[in-house]
A protein has these predicted regions:
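Domain-terminus/edge residues, biased toward the C-terminal soluble/receptor-binding domains
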Residues: 140-141, 152-273
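Sec-dependent N-terminal signal peptides of Gram-positive bacterial secreted proteins and lipoproteins
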Residues: 4-22
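Active-site-adjacent loops and short helices of periplasmic peptidoglycan-processing enzymes
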Residues: 18-161, 165-172
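Non-catalytic cell-wall polysaccharide-engagement segments
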Residues: 3, 130, 254
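Amphipathic, positively biased hydrophobic alpha-helical segments used for protein targeting
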Residues: 14, 42, 50, 72-73, ...
C-alpha cells in the first residue's frame, strides 16, 4: 500500500511537471529549443520559417575564421572595414590579431570586426562562400548568407532550426566556446563586455550570440549546460528574448528531470515534444 501511495505521488508530480512544461508562451515569431547532444527538438515555433537573423550570423563567421586563420596572425585595418551598426571601434591603420577581432566579433558584435576577419579569410566574397559551404556541411538546409556581419539582405536568411544546428556545432569548437562564454575581455589594449546578459543571469549559460536590426528585430542564440545536459535555444524576432530564453530553459530542463524520474520508477512516459 505504501509503495502504491509513493508511486501515485510521483506520477502526480510528473503530471504537474508535464502540464507546466507544455504551458510555454513566448513572444518570438520563430523559436527552437534543442538538445545539443542528440539534436532532439524539445520545443518549436515556426522552426522552418526563413527569417533575417542579424548578428547571430557572426557565429558562423567565427567558425569559418577559426577553421582557416591562426589566432596570432594580424590584420591591418583599412577604411573598407568600417561599417554601420555595432562596432569594436577599429581605426584604419592599426594592426589587430585575429584573436582580438574574434572577441570584438562575439562580445562587442563588431560589424567592423566581421569585415576585418573576412579580410583575413581572403576577402568578403571568399569568406561568405566558406560560410555557405560550412552551413551546408552542418546540415543547415534552409539557410543562405551573403555577408559576414548579418546586416539585412534579400539573400541572407536562416531558420530557428538551422541556427540551433549551428549553435550545437559551435559548441564543439573549444576556442569559440572560450571566447563567447567570456563576460568581459581585456585584449589588444581594449576592454570588451559581452552583450549576452544570460551569461550573468542564467545558471550554466555558456554564451553564444545576440543580434538586432530594425528589420530582423531582436535575435538571440544561447546555450546552457546543467548536470551533463546541454540545451540550445534560438529565438527570432523576439522583443522579450531574455525572458523567453529563461522560460525555454526552465521548460527544457524540467521535462528532462521528469523523464528521468519516470524512468527511475520503471515507467516509459514520453516527456519530449
Amino acid at each position: 500500500m505504501k509503495g502504491r501511495r509513493v508511486a501515485a505521488t510521483v506520477l502526480a508530480m510528473l503530471f504537474l511537471l508535464t502540464q507546466r512544461a507544455w504551458a510555454v508562451d513566448i513572444s518570438a515569431t520563430a523559436a527552437v529549443l534543442m538538445d545539443a547532444d542528440t539534436g532532439r527538438i524539445l520545443y518549436e515555433k515556426n522552426p522552418d520559417r526563413r527569417m533575417l537573423v542579424a548578428s547571430t550570423t557572426k557565429i558562423l563567421t567565427a567558425l569559418v575564421v577559426l577553421e582557416s586563420c591562426e589566432l596570432r596572425s594580424t590584420v591591418k585595418v583599412t577604411q573598407e572595414h568600417m561599417a554601420e551598426g555595432s562596432s569594436m571601434y577599429l581605426k584604419p591603420g592599426e594592426e589587430v590579431t585575429v584573436e582580438c577581432l574574434l572577441y570584438g566579433l562575439l562580445l562587442a558584435s563588431g560589424n567592423d570586426a566581421a569585415l576585418a576577419l573576412a579580410e583575413a579569410c581572403g576577402g568578403v566574397e571568399p569568406c561568405v562562400r566558406a560560410m555557405n559551404r560550412l552551413a551546408g556541411r552542418i546540415g543547415m538546409t534552409d539557410s543562405h548568407f551573403e555577408n559576414p556581419n548579418g546586416l539585412d539582405g534579400e539573400a541572407h536568411y536562416s531558420t530557428a532550426r538551422d541556427m540551433a544546428k549551428l549553435a550545437s556545432y559551435a559548441l564543439k569548437q573549444p576556442t569559440f566556446l572560450r571566447i563567447c562564454s567570456t563576460t568581459t575581455a581585456h585584449v589588444g589594449g581594449r576592454t570588451m563586455t559581452n552583450h549576452n546578459r544570460l551569461l550573468r543571469e542564467v545558471e550554466g549559460c555558456m554564451g553564444m550570440k545576440t543580434g538586432y536590426t530594425k528589420a530582423a528585430g531582436r535575435t538571440l542564440v544561447s546555450c546552457v549546460e546543467r548536470e551533463g545536459r546541454t540545451l540550445v535555444a534560438v529565438t527570432l524576432q523576439d522583443g522579450n528574448d531574455w525572458a523567453d530564453h529563461r522560460t525555454l530553459y526552465e521548460f527544457g530542463f524540467s521535462r528532462a528531470d521528469a523523464a528521468e524520474t519516470a524512468a527511475a520508477c520503471g515507467r516509459k512516459e514520453r516527456f519530449w515534444i
